């Protein structure tokens, strides 16, 4: 090891260790060293075509992404450095990103700039012409009245035209930017690791796309009108310049107004950020309570929990009201102080300006213009104060979005598949182009490109899963949010290709965790899962999802029609009505579907609530039949059904399981007796393995479970 050189650097959230080959054995030791990888050479004949490939690519396998140990590369690669530089900016939303998105609309931005100058010029010219108007009236100015009024009429006509052009173009730019941001945030949430969704509630995540992005949206939409935002700034700046040009003696009076307002803005900035944050948090909490209550309305009804939910929501309403009152108090105090500063400035102007007119040092028209500019400055300053207040809310919202979406790393194996599908294939769906508009820096800056280059081709994945065995090899696992609680402890199990394996055991033994690992919602903390001898982490998750199908005890249907729910088995493909009907018939669902009011076009309600449990199961089975995945997982698929529904569903499941590698999890042992092998899980390990008759003869844990259930039915 003395001659081995090691270079350690960070890539975003991924730690990459660049070392000489002599270091590989020590890094692979948590997975049993190199032996597990090289032992593929002794695989059965069914995987013989892959042996040479495995020998030749063992280095690539060693470099592949694995949970728990960093990937290994032999030499630094320029792709890594490129990826590293892209990952330096961790925030999902930054002002640099907003500007880059806006700068794509150069023509509209140019129009906005010109019309903004036109608006401000018209507004700033009006007090000057007002002063001239009074001078003409008192005979001090020899200009004809009709000519002066014509000029004023032109100004009054041009100002709304410029305003319409400015607001229209600025709105178009910002709505395009917001559409891209919504798409990117939605995509970022989708590709987070599973523990992200364990940590955050649905209401919190919904709030990112509604209230938080709404605050960002309002910073432009609510500040492009007169006397707000950019226009207010140009009017303040232009007014100060004109005032010093007209009268250097009176200008400092209004300059004091600007100084006072600047102090107010600084105080406002410090005082309102926590208030805005608490207000947004209270709003998200309310949204989460509403979502959770309505989604579990049957549970609430069954326990007569309406009063409790009303009490909980009432407390949240009061918290939101109090935070709103506090926020309103801050706004009112700042606006009141601003008005007081304006009135004091006006009073000083009347006193000083009037005395100078009396002594002949200033013309009446100049003082009248000053009064007009005072009101212009008043509205503009108040608009700026409101704009700065909106900015505080926007900063708080952006901080909330970035803190949530950067707290947990993205699931790179999933993100890579999406990037590949969207960027390397011709996008047929117009809606997906929103996810391309932000450019590659937004989409893939967090991905380790060198790790991605080591993922295996997906061309052979479907062949592997149809012909190869699925092996869980010395798998250890603890949920990321409970790292001290080991759920699986060295579990090993082989699902033979084309056969049915039943998994039984007491609650908490780790059965559902095995399902989540096979579905790759999580990755093993230690050990590996292979298919046909290939580590499943060598394939991106979007491709893996296409070869694994899960039917749960409570399948989730979308608020779509029956046909659309079945077609969701192939969400990225066009599915014909004939294929949908064929799958429904195979799932014993066709008869009940055609009896529905609109047949296959009948809406199923939220989460399929308008269908019975057996009907939902058969629709889910039809969806899996259409998917035609070689690996099938049945997680308590019939445990909640009555006898008639169970018979129909079990008949459909038998057709679904044919020639597929199937894992069946069931508490009722009568449903697993015909399995090719039965595995008994206890304390995160497989303690017994065999057929029903073999395990009964052993008189172990399985025999005890069988005896217990027999007694329960006697």
UniProtKB/Swiss-Prot annotation:
Record's bilayer topology term: Multi-pass membrane protein
Pfam families associated with the record: ABC_membrane, ABC_tran
Segments forming domain ABC transporter: 470-708
GO molecular function list: ABC-type transporter activity; ATP binding; ATP hydrolysis activity
Transmembrane segments: 109-129, 161-181, 240-260, 340-360, 361-381
Entry's localization field: Membrane
InterPro entries named in the record: AAA+_ATPase (IPR003593), ABC1_TM_dom (IPR011527), ABC1_TM_sf (IPR036640), ABC_transporter-like_ATP-bd (IPR003439), ABC_transporter-like_CS (IPR017871), P-loop_NTPase (IPR027417), Type_1_exporter (IPR039421)
Family: Belongs to the ABC transporter superfamily. ABCB family. Multidrug resistance exporter (TC 3.A.1.201) subfamily.
Name assigned to this protein: ABC transporter B family member 28
Lineage: Eukaryota, Viridiplantae, Streptophyta, Embryophyta, Tracheophyta
């Amino acid at each position: 090891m003395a001659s081995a050189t090691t270079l350690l650097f960070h890539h975003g959230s991924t730690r990459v260790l660049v070392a000489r080959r002599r270091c590989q054995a020590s890094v692979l030791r948590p997975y049993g060293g190199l032996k597990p990888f090289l032992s593929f050479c002794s695989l059965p004949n069914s995987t013989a075509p892959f042996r040479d490939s495995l020998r030749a690519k063992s280095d690539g396998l060693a470099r592949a992404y694995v949970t728990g140990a960093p990937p290994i590369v032999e030499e630094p690669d320029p792709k890594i450095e490129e990826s590293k530089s892209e990952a330096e900016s961790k925030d999902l939303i930054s002002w640099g990103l907003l500007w880059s998105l806006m700068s794509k609309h150069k023509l509209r931005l140019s129009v906005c700039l010109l019309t903004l100058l036109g608006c401000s010029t018209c507004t700033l010219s009006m007090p000057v012409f007002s002063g001239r108007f009074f001078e003409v009236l008192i005979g001090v100015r020899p200009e004809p009245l009709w000519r002066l009024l014509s000029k004023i009429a032109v100004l009054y006509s041009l100002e709304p035209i410029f305003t319409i052009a400015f607001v229209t173009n600025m709105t178009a730019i910002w709505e395009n930017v917001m559409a891209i941001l919504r798409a990117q945030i939605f995509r970022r949430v989708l590709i987070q690791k599973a523990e992200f969704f364990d940590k955050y509630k649905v209401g919190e995540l919904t709030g990112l796309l509604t209230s938080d992005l709404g605050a960002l949206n309002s910073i432009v939409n609510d500040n492009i009108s007169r006397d707000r935002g950019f226009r207010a700034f140009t009017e303040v700046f232009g007014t100060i310049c004109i005032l010093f040009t007209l009268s250097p003696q009176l200008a400092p009076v209004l300059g004091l107004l600007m100084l006072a307002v600047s102090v107010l803005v600084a105080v406002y900035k410090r005082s309102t950020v926590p208030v805005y944050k608490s207000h947004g948090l209270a709003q998200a909490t309310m949204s989460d309570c509403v979502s959770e209550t309505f989604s579990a309305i049957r549970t609430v009804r069954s326990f007569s929990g309406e009063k409790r939910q009303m009490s909980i929501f009432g407390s949240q309403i009061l918290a939101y009201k109090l935070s709103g009152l506090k926020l309103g108090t801050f706004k009112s105090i700042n606006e009141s102080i601003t008005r007081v500063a304006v009135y004091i400035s006006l009073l000083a102007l009347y006193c000083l300006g009037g005395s100078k007119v009396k002594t002949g040092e200033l013309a009446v028209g100049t003082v009248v213009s000053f009064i007009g500019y005072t009101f212009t400055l008043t509205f503009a300053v108040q608009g700026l104060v409101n704009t700065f207040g909106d900015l505080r809310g926007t900063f708080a919202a952006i901080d909330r979005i970035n803190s949530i979406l950067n707290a947990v790393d993205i699931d790179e194996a999933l993100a890579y598949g999406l990037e590949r599908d969207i960027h390397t294939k011709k996008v047929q769906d117009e809606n997906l182009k929103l996810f391309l508009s932000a450019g590659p820096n937004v989409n893939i800056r967090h991905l380790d490109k060198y790790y991605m280059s080591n993922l295996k081709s997906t061309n052979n994945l479907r062949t592997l899963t149809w012909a190869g065995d699925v092996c869980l090899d010395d798998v250890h696992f603890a949920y990321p949010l409970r790292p001290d609680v080991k759920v699986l402890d060295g579990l090993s199990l082989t699902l033979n290709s084309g056969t049915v394996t039943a998994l039984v055991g007491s609650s908490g033994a780790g059965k559902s965790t095995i399902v989540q690992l096979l579905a790759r919602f999580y990755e093993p903390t230690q050990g590996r899962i292979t298919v046909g001898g290939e580590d499943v982490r060598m394939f991106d998750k979007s491709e893996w999802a296409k070869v694994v199908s899960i039917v749960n005890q409570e399948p989730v249907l979308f608020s779509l029609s029956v046909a659309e729910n079945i077609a969701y088995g192939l969400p990225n493909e066009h599915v014909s009505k004939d294929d949908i009907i064929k799958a429904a018939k195979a799932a014993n669902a066709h008869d009940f579907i055609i009896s529905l009011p609109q047949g296959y076009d009948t809406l199923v309600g939220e989460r399929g609530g308008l269908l019975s449990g057996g009907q939902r199961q058969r629709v889910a089975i039809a969806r899996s039949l259409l998917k035609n995945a070689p690996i099938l997982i049945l997680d308590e698929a019939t445990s909640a059904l009555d006898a008639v529904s169970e018979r129909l569903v079990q008949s459909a499941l038998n057709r679904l399981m044919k020639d597929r590698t199937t894992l069946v999890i069931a508490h009722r042992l009568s449903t697993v007796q015909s399995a090719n092998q039965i595995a008994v899980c206890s304390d995160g390990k497989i303690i017994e393995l065999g057929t029903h008759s073999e395990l009964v003869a052993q008189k172990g844990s399985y025999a005890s479970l069988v005896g217990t259930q027999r007694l329960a039915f006697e």
